[in-house]
């Protein structure tokens, strides 16, 4: 049996995002609307927080979460192009992060886990 949305993605979330989402829901926010709004802004962490707290189909949650990563990738690509033009040089790390976001979106749509690479702290 395949893993649920929560089993696949809950471990990616920091408590601060869940706390924010919970507060918004307690104030009467519509969780699905909030998740979609954050997804459109390219903020997958916020979208995920709402998606984990609301009822909805696995497919619907995957779609919104994947869209958040795709939107963030698009915004990153636009920012990289803007910086390329402004500073007359490329910004490959921004483009690399956009590629990772697109791969994450694809994995989410397929119901697979995603890998989040974390930069170790500088000592």
Residue positions per predicted region:
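Generic helix N-cap/helix-start motif at coil->alpha-helix transitions
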Residues: 12-17, 25-31, 41-45, 58-65
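Structural register within alpha-helical repeat arrays
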Residues: 20, 34, 47, 65-68, ...
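Alpha-helical solenoid repeat scaffolds, predominantly canonical TPR units
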Residues: 37-38, 50, 83, 101, ...
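Alpha-helical junction/boundary sensor with strong preference for TPR arrays
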Residues: 58-59, 72, 76, 83-84, ...
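Terminal, low-structured helical/coil segments at or just beyond the last alpha-helical repeat
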Residues: 95-99, 103-104, 110-123
């Amino acid at each position: 049996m395949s893993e649920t949305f929560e089993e696949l993605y809950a471990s990616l979330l920091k408590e601060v995002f869940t706390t924010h989402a919970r507060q918004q829901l307690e104030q009467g926010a519509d969780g699905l609307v909030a998740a979609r709004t954050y997804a459109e802004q390219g903020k997958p962490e916020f979208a995920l927080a709402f998606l984990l707290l609301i009822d909805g189909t696995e497919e619907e949650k995957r779609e919104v979460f994947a869209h958040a990563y795709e939107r963030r990738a698009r915004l990153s690509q636009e920012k990289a192009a803007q910086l390329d033009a402004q500073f007359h040089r490329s910004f490959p790390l921004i483009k690399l992060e956009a590629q990772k976001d697109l791969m994450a979106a694809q994995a989410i749509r397929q119901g697979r886990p995603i890998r989040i690479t974390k930069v170790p702290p500088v000592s």
